[in-house]
Amino acid sequence: MDNVTRYKITESSQSSSQAYYHLSFELSEQQSYASEHIVRAIRMRQTILLYAVTGAGKTEMMFQGIQYARRQGDNIAIVSPRVDVVVEISKRIKDAFLNEDIDILHQQSSQQFEGHFVVCTVHQLYRFKQHFDTIFIDEVDAFPLSMDKSLQQALKSSSKVEHATIYMTATPPKQLLSEIPHENIIKLPAR
């Protein structure tokens, strides 16, 4: 018996927003440095790795980049292999970006908006074809993403040809460290 999941493919379109966000604290010097690198990677359509310890504020370091991307009309996705991480991150994102239409997609949710700003599990990327200008991948080292070639392919096929990818993790796989140029690895050793 085959286990087949059907996905509705979201039609790709562009739409900008102001992407105002509220952050209840000021980023540290290290966090600001990482945030600026994220914006540059989005602007230049680069792949970078944010290598920071757990609790370093990786989610909040994304905010300036999200704002920049949405103001340009970019479609963005924040992706995690795990539902619990998607739920936790989506709460923080929705609390910060109060006026944004954000699709939260995982096995117990459904798409409500146009897919311009998505927080989802990696499996949900099958809904999108050459749609995202920017993809943030949290916990890139986590199972099943790290071991499943079809999920890695879903990341590629959901992205536009010219796109930015921001990998985020406290424990990067050796293969990822070897694939990303040293100057595109932002390492934050402390909280």
Where would I find each of the regions flagged by the language model?
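Conserved RecA-like ASCE P-loop NTPase motor core of nucleic-acid helicases/translocases
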Residues: D74-R82
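Conserved catalytic network of the ASCE P-loop NTPase/AAA+ motor domain
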Residues: Y68-R71, S110-Q112, R127-Q130, S157-E162
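Post-DEXD/H (motif II) to motif III coupling segment of the RecA-like Helicase ATP-binding lobe
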Residues: Q130-R191
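Inter-Walker segment of RecA-like/P-loop motor cores
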Residues: V87-E88, R92-K129
